[in-house]
Amino acid sequence: LELPHFLILDEMNLSHVERYFADFLSVMESKEEIPMHSGEIENGVPAKLEIPSNLFIIGTVNIDETTYMFSPKVLDRANTIEFRLTTDNLEKYIGSEIKLDMKLLKAQGTNMSDGFMAMALKETDKNLKPSEADLILFFSELKKSGAEFGYRTASEIGRLMYMLKELGESGDNLLDIAIMQKLLPKLHGSRSKLNTALTTLAKFCVKDAVKDFDGKDEDFRKTYFIPFDKLPTDSLAKIKYKISFEKISRMHKNVMENGFTSYAEA
């Protein structure tokens, strides 16, 4: 159990995750063994399967007409990390004269295994006091859209923020990353359902916006729901949760243009 092992599920949503992964999802919290069959060891297969503490599961996801969306049960038990390709990223890749060599990545992380396992197995007490007020705001608004979170998510947010702090993150970045990975992924719906909700959530990401734009949703949208790189310096400086705000802004643009939006499609 000293070395971490990673199970990579490529394009894991080509089938319903909550169906083929149901047994694993059930034991993630209970730490019980997964029942395989009723007998003893049969053809090398044990009657029960224990999920070791050094096993970590990573899944890649694509969203198109051939894939399935995730249920709340799956999202509640996962951290969702979005990777976006920018124009600048693509220009640098195309213009680079260095050939991509995946062999150079082989065994590059072996010296990190001890520290990785130490952090993964560390028992931490959730400390949400610094972010308590904002978490309650997000909970109240997400509940209106049926995307509220529970005790499990709150506890995992506390653990995530602790780990991020251990890795050098600080200040508003801690909750910003947690909002992006743990709260927004469950948000999806129509224009009538999310127009006001996304505006309110965006206000929570901007200092004093709830007070300054009280009853002035349209003014807020005109001021802040513009391309991120075109925001005035003074407006940009007021955004305390920049990653989450940019995502919410993209989701709002999507719902206004297409009548529907979700975290995965924004």
Question: What is each residue range found by the language model?
Answer:
Residues 1-266:
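C-terminal regulatory/interaction module of P-loop NTP-utilizing enzymes
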